[in-house]
């Protein structure tokens, strides 16, 4: 499994670099930059023909926007109606008239999806934390229930993006265990246990620098066989 940026790839005239998160009409400081969102979508979902991209905690819509703008089917969900309205505004600003967004609970995805939904090839997650998290469930329980809910409807791959402490060295290969930076909200062992308990198999992780006090880790997992 290799990892990198695809430049000049996608529909003609499309440029994720020109759609910086801070330029969207509906913006939150925690929003992912489009290049990272596009990379996560491609890694989780593979070739366009594989099926739809599921973004069950869509927030401002970053993953879903990049999926749609690259020619994929996508479903963006959020429990917060304000986020759904903002995500729709952002997708229209990006140049699409599609409406792939729906109000729904990430911990009960099956109840939100319609029976005629396209086959889902992968799921992308950038979980909220603290004041950015909705509802009374703490962020650990929220992530655990969301991973289990996603596994019920996805028999493919998962990309989970987590904030981390910064690394002094940038790597262009998967992180070895001794190279993993401390995560901001979890222990690495907790993440691996969560994945295992919810039907996912940890494969690899990569580090992406954000600024001198923050990094992000891209965790890649595949669906484990279910009994």
PLM feature spans:
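Class I S-adenosyl-L-methionine-dependent methyltransferase catalytic core
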Residues: 1-227
